[in-house]
């Protein structure tokens, strides 16, 4: 499963309402960390967001090291990902999201994201590309 950058932000001590990694470690979601994959562009996006928020560079570097060790990180510059991301860019304004979604499409893996535009287009994406789009709440185990 490809995870969006949002879920990596807590590793750089950036608070989010949807801490997928913590929930996974605690067994509260239906996906294990070992099943999660990250686009390399998410590392850059995390770094940029952390810089904007004034997070110390040492914390960011540590987060990037953890991501590289804990996850399968997929390059964003493969021919297929570039082609699909350019195609998606015609209807999606955020190129980071295009690349992350393109990574899921090219690998044939499901995507978990909180992005409202992707969720608005979820039915079309799922039908056209035969992947599933989830958000954090949909991965929570039923109690």
Residue ranges: model-predicted function:
Residues 94-110:
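Acidic, metal-associated active-site segment
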Residues 7-8, 42, 80-81, 99-100, ...:
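Alpha-helix capping/helix-boundary segments
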Residues 70, 74, 105-106, 110-143:
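Acidic, PIN/NYN-like endoribonuclease modules and their adjacent C-terminal/linker elements
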Residues 68-90:
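Acidic catalytic patch
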Residues 26-31, 64-68, 124-127:
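Short, conserved catalytic or adaptor-binding loops enriched in Gly and charged residues
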Residues 1-38, 50-62, 140-142:
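Short, well-structured N-terminal submotif of metal-dependent ribonuclease cores
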């Amino acid at each position: 499963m490809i995870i969006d950058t949002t879920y990596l932000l807590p590793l750089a001590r950036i608070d989010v309402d949807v801490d997928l990694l913590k929930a996974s470690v605690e067994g509260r979601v239906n996906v294990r960390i070992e099943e999660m994959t990250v686009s390399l562009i998410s590392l850059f996006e995390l770094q940029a967001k952390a810089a904007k928020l004034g997070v110390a560079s040492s914390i960011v570097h540590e987060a990037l090291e953890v991501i590289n060790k804990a996850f399968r990180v997929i390059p964003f510059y493969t021919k297929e990902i570039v082609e699909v991301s350019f195609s998606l860019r015609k209807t999606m304004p955020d190129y980071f999201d295009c690349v992350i979604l393109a990574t899921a499409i090219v690998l044939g893996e499901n995507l978990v994201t909180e992005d409202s535009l992707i969720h608005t287009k979820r039915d079309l994406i799922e039908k056209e590309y035969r992947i599933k789009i989830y958000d954090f709440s949909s991965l929570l185990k039923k109690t």
